[in-house]
């Protein structure tokens, strides 16, 4: 899996270019099947959960095809790359929100629109609780549960690359009053999808950086994480 994942990570750079600059017709040709797309075609606000795959850029293009969706981004240090990224994404998503604009993204959904949100990342402990992720307790953002409690749909999008294109499937995460139960089901949707194509998951993404015991399983990133924590405190 390690070797295949490294290959897929490299291929992801090519897929990024395809996502940013290909025509809609080319994107349509890459989509084998979009199962349950009708779930997303209503006029109600929906939080659309995306997965961190090695082809995440093309995933956003595929899932938003023919649908008006907003998305979040983390600014890149290189201003040129950042400019290219935002301009490219603005061609196929309705609005690009800074990753720190949480309240704006929630308002976006409340206004009857669809927001792409990657809930499989570690946002720290401030707005998260620990929930199993592959039987490992992982810091899990609680925003999706909050949205579901406001009677908005939370829909997980599974995308796997096959030999002849990409399979896309939408599945609603059933609302639950209990926060832990809802988030456990959400994480299970993620892990079930990852198991289908483990080589396509972005394992270099630090999913387990916040630990119950306060430990650090990514020591090489320690200084960068300390800087980001200070940035979050000052924001």
Task: List PLM regions with ranges.
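Acidic side chains
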Residues: 15, 57, 120-122
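A structural signal for well-ordered alpha-helical scaffolds and beta->alpha junctions
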Residues: 2, 6, 78, 82, ...
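Short hydrophobic/aromatic-rich motifs at helix boundaries and adjacent loops
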Residues: 31, 54-59, 75-77, 116-118, ...
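Catalytic core of membrane glycerolipid acyltransferases/transacylases, capturing the structured
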Residues: 4, 42-100, 125-132
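Membrane-anchoring hydrophobic helices of lipid-metabolizing enzymes
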Residues: 1-49, 60, 82-88, 93, ...
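A conditional alpha-helix N-cap/helix-loop micro-motif detector
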Residues: 28-30, 78, 95-99, 137-138, ...
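Non-catalytic C-terminal accessory region of glycerolipid acyltransferases
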Residues: 40-43, 103-235
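Conserved beta-strand termini and adjacent loop/short-helix elements that scaffold enzyme active sites
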Residues: 35, 72-74, 98-100, 171-173, ...
């Amino acid at each position: 899996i390690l070797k295949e994942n490294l290959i897929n990570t490299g291929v992801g750079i090519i897929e990024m270019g395809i996502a940013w600059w290909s025509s809609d017709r080319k994107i349509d040709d890459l989509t084998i099947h979009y199962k349950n797309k009708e779930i997303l075609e209503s006029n109600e606000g929906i939080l659309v959960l995306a997965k961190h795959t090695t082809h995440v850029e093309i995933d956003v293009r595929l899932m938003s095809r023919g649908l008006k969706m907003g998305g979040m981004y983390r600014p890149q240090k290189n201003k040129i790359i950042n400019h290219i990224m935002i301009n490219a994404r603005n061609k196929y998503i309705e609005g690009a929100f800074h990753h720190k604009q949480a309240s704006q993204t929630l308002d976006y959904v409340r206004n009857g629109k669809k927001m792409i949100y990657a809930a499989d990342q570690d946002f720290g402990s401030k707005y998260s609780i620990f929930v199993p992720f592959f039987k490992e307790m992982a810091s899990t953002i609680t925003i999706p549960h909050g949205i579901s409690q406001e009677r908005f749909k939370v829909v997980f999008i599974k995308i796997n690359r096959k030999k002849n294109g990409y399979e896309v499937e939408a599945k609603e995460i059933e609302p639950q009053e209990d926060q832990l139960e809802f988030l456990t089901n959400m994480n299970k949707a993620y892990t079930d999808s990852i198991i289908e194509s483990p080589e396509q998951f972005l394992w270099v993404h630090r999913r387990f950086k916040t630990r119950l015991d306060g430990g650090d399983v990514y020591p090489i990133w320690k200084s960068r994480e300390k800087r980001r924590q200070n940035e979050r405190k000052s924001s």
